[in-house]
Swiss-Prot record:
The lineage of its organism: Bacteria, Pseudomonadati, Pseudomonadota, Gammaproteobacteria, Lysobacterales. This protein is involved in the repair of mismatches in DNA. It is possible that it carries out the mismatch recognition step. This protein has a weak ATPase activity. The keyword rRNA-binding does not apply. This is DNA mismatch repair protein MutS. InterPro entries: DNA_mismatch_repair_MutS, DNA_mismatch_repair_MutS-lik_N, DNA_mismatch_repair_MutS/MSH, DNA_mismatch_repair_MutS_C, DNA_mismatch_repair_MutS_clamp, DNA_mismatch_repair_MutS_core, DNA_mismatch_repair_MutS_N, DNA_mismatch_repair_MutS_sf.
């Protein structure tokens, strides 16, 4: 909605400044407008009210315009990034309207122009970004059977696309990438979960056209076709990429030289994990929103922020490309064997975030400290190359080459940039001494001013006889001679009064005025010269942007591999063996997170699955370790396929295409967020998508409904997974009846199902969980003991024991199972699987015998007989 001048006045009745403001605001009605006025960014009218509320800053008034007071709020320019970060975190977008040119030289109203739009997905400033998490902007396009995705990490200079063929796959990609801002065509009826996301921005549908997207990409990258990017035959990905690029150009309002290519990701290259699996495995965020005690929290010992971001990306996209993963394993092993990881790690401590610094160089927003950090990082390359040169690891040899030689750029920055430059270019002192003769001369003139002023003060005191006379300077009035009020009558006649204070008078002389003009001119010229030299440095570095980006990417990967080597040695992890044949054999496996946070020794357990043993039915008491066991094996598989060592004594892992989980309601990990419908929805997804190369975790299927319904569901799901999907399945259940599945045959052969259990023992009236997986089914549930441990009142537990004894006795007497007897005693729940009533049954229900005559009753009887 466009903001109109308040008070009902036309534009003609507003001041020139407010006319200028309303003209700028009319172009960006839905954004907050930061309107530069001197040392402040001001917001007016509705923007001011909104900003005052969101930022807790003062709402004031600035005179009036058109006869109406002007609501106003402002933030200082020197601290605006902190306020901007808070607004972006709240989902707001901001248009930055700057003063163009030198306000001091402007005749009349200074020119202003919107130079940039800052949105949640387009931030590049260091102060606004999360150091170890990508900030992504994404666009979506679709046809009936295809979704196109394009996303950009502007701060890191990455541009990627993908296509998926289902809404489930789209949801999985969104869960993996977690875009900060999402662009959707305005006319499409997108799923509800998409529309409710934070950061969704509707765009005109014609911007998502594949042909116009192709033309835009060709023009931007200066190409004749898109085959080099591998997207020539991907119209939906092209459409999304074109819409994304258009939005970036619209918001950034400048060249984007750091976006140099597009990467086409293929779903088949990676192990698929949907949103539920990522949530259940708590890769980097717990289900309660906390980031502590997650897999990433245990795994991440990277030194650099860019390494931390790459590790997070790897963790969310384990690869199916076994040769790529094996090369990572080999690189980690080579580092461990040669102690290379420790040597590299020490060097990495002095590395900066080159990836994001190079983006700011390309966008001309790099600050002096960015350039000095880049200088220091490039100066480390000779040492890093020396360390890597002796390695025989194929991957480390590739990374050695990718680092490149940047001696000339490093040497230039060493000569050109001061050792510890100021934060801002306008503070001066960024360019090192002896780099530029002209700058040195201007600085010398400015620096010699101090001695001149000391000499002048001494001479004037002696010639005037005024002991309190002193020479000073301030930014408003420039240089002055100050004399106290008591001696002001002694001021020489050639002194010209410049300023009157309460206790002193300030004067200027012709000599001091001439000196002031000379010095201030030298300072201004020195700053202008520094700015020119600084821009030249950015040009020089920018010309090497592509090889420098490859260098930063290599450093990031080295940091992650060093992290893997350090974790393997510190946590006693082993190198997994990736097999071509189908198997999942883990000896002495441990849960990486549980082991890291608990004080007691973690009890390791084995897992052995192969084509004739594809499912384990896991029974045992609650708290016995079933859920931990299932998750630890999924995490071990995931770690193996990102290139990490794993928490086990040995691990042989065959091809895996998906990791799928169904965690039941009531689990501590799920925090009671699941419902029976959600349980069935997630189970349905697994049954429809699991393959013979999938790893599936099923935890307590069926407990959200009645006992019979739940048991029937669990039985049917287990059979489907074992015989139809034929996937690797860990099936934890409290239904003891399912243990009989292992004894059945299927199509003349074994069922492929085996029983294992976790046990507990009672010792001194205490229940001790063994946390050790054993072959065979459990023989006790220990439900009442667990209830007592949970703190149920003793009287309640005692009553339960008596009731259990009664049920068991009645079961023995009637030769029916305890579960059947319990069901007979309980109120009956509607059967989920009851068949639909027959026509005869419906007709019978509709009869009202008391209202029928004998003849009508006979006719009804014949009709019923005909329906049978």
């Amino acid at each position: 909605m466009r903001e109109k001048p308040e008070g009902g006045k036309g534009m003609a009745e507003h001041t020139p400044l407010m006319k200028q403001y309303f003209a700028a605001k009319a172009e960006y009605p839905d954004l907050l407008l930061f309107f530069r006025m001197g040392d402040f960014y001001e917001l007016f009218h509705q923007d001011a009210r909104k900003a005052a509320r969101l930022l807790d800053i003062t709402l004031t008034q600035r005179g009036s315009s058109g006869g109406t007071p002007i609501p106003m709020a402002g933030v200082p320019v020197h601290a605006y990034e902190g306020y901007l970060a808070r607004l972006i975190a709240l989902g707001e977008s901001v248009a930055i309207c700057e003063q163009i040119g030198d306000p001091g030289l402007a005749k009349g109203l200074v020119e202003r122009k919107v130079v940039r739009i800052v949105t949640p997905g387009t931030i590049t400033e260091e102060a606004l970004l999360e150091e170890r998490r990508d900030t992504l902007l994404m666009a979506l396009s679709r046809t009936k059977n295809c979704y196109g995705l394009a996303w950009a990490d502007l701060a890191g200079g990455r541009f990627l696309v993908n296509e998926v063929d289902s809404e489930e796959a789209l949801e999985a990609e969104l869960a993996r990438l977690e875009p900060a801002e999402l662009l959707l065509p305005d006319e499409d009826a997108w799923p509800e979960y998409l529309q409710q996301r934070n950061g969704v921005r509707r765009r005109p549908p014609w911007l998502f056209d594949a042909d116009s997207g192709r033309r835009k990409l060709l023009a931007f990258f200066k190409l004749h076709d898109l085959s080099g990017f591998g997207i020539e035959n991907n119209p939906q990905a092209t459409a999304a990429a074109g819409a994304l690029l258009g939005y970036i150009e619209e918001t950034q309002k400048q060249r984007l030289p750091h976006l140099t290519s597009i990467t086409m990701e293929t779903v088949g290259e990676a192990i698929t994990m949907n949103a539920a699996t990522r949530r259940h495995l708590e890769l980097d965020t717990r289900v309660d929103g906390e980031s502590r005690h997650t897999l990433l929290g245990v795994l991440d010992s990277t030194v650099t922020p860019m390494g931390g971001r790459l590790l997070r990306r790897w963790l969310h996209r384990p690869l199916r490309l076994r040769e790529v993963v094996r090369q990572r394993h080999a690189a980690v092993g080579s580092m461990i064997d040669s102690d290379l990881d420790n040597k590299l790690r020490e060097t990495f401590r002095r590395l900066g975030d080159m990836e994001r610094i190079l983006t700011r160089v390309a966008l001309r927003s790099a600050r002096p400290r960015d350039i000095s950090t880049l200088r220091d990082s490039l100066s480390l390359l000779p040492r890093l190359r020396e360390l890597l040169n002796a390695s025989d690891s194929p991957r480390l040899r590739v990374l050695y080459a990718e680092l490149g030689e940047h001696d000339s750029t490093a040497s230039l920055l060493v000569k050109a940039v001061a050792e510890q430059p100021p934060l801002k270019l306008t503070d001066g002192g960024v360019i090192a001494p002896e780099y530029d003769v002209e700058l040195d001369e201007l600085r010398k003139l400015s620096n010699n001013a101090d001695q001149f002023l000391i000499d002048l003060e001494t001479r004037e005191r002696e010639s005037s006889g005024i002991s309190t006379l002193k020479v000073g300077y301030n930014r408003v009035h420039g240089y002055y001679i100050e004399i106290s009020k008591g001696q002001a009558d002694k001021a020489p006649v050639h002194y010209t009064r410049r300023q009157t204070l309460t206790n002193a008078e300030r004067y200027i002389t012709e000599e001091l005025k001439a000196f002031e003009d000379k010095v201030l001119s030298a300072r201004d010229r020195a700053l202008a010269r520094e700015k020119l030299l600084y821009e030249q440095l950015l040009d020089t570095v920018g010309a090497q942007l592509e090889p420098l980006k490859r260098c930063a990417a290599a450093l990031s990967e080295l940091d992650v591999l060093v992290c893997f080597a350090e974790r393997a040695q510190t946590l006693d992890w082993v190198r997994p063996e990736l097999e071509h044949t189908s198997c999942l054999h883990i000896e002495g496996g441990r849960h990486p997170v549980v082991e890291a946070v608990r004080e007691q020794r973690f009890e390791p357990n084995d897992l052995y699955l192969h084509p004739e043993r594809r499912m384990l039915v896991i029974t045992g008491p609650n708290m016995g370790g079933k859920s931990t066991y299932m998750r630890q094996n999924a995490l071990i598989v995931l770690l193996a396929y990102i290139g990490s060592y794993v928490p086990a004594s040995r691990a042989l892992i065959g091809p895996i295409d998906r990791i799928m989980t169904r965690i039941g309601a009531g689990d501590d990990l799920a925090r009671g967020q699941s419902t029976f419908m959600l349980e069935m929805t997630e189970t349905s997804y697994i049954l429809h998508h699991a393959t013979a190369q999938s790893l599936v975790l099923m935890d307590e299927i069926g407990r959200g409904t009645s006992t019979y319904d739940g048991l029937a569901l669990a039985d049917a799901v287990a059979r489907h997974l074992a015989h139809i999907n034929r996937c690797y399945t860990l099936f934890a259940t409290h239904y003891f009846e399912l243990t009989a599945l292992a004894e059945e045959t299927y199509e003349g052969g074994l069922s492929g199902i085996a029983n294992v259990h976790f046990d507990a023992v009672e010792h001194s009236e205490r229940l001790v969980f063994m946390h050790t997986v054993k072959d065979g089914p459990a023989n006790r549930s220990f439900g009442l003991q667990v209830a007592a441990l949970a703190g149920l009142p003793a009287a309640t537990v005692a009553q339960a024991r008596r009731r259990l004894a009664e049920l068991e006795q009645r079961g023995r007497e009637s030769h029916v199972s305890e579960i059947t007897q319990l069901e007979l005693d309980a109120p009956q729940q509607c059967n989920l699987f009851a068949s639909a009533p027959s026509a005869a049954q419906e007709a019978l229900v509709a009869l009202h015998p008391d209202e029928l005559t004998p003849k009508q009753a006979l006719e009804a009887l014949y009709r019923l007989k005909a329906l049978l």
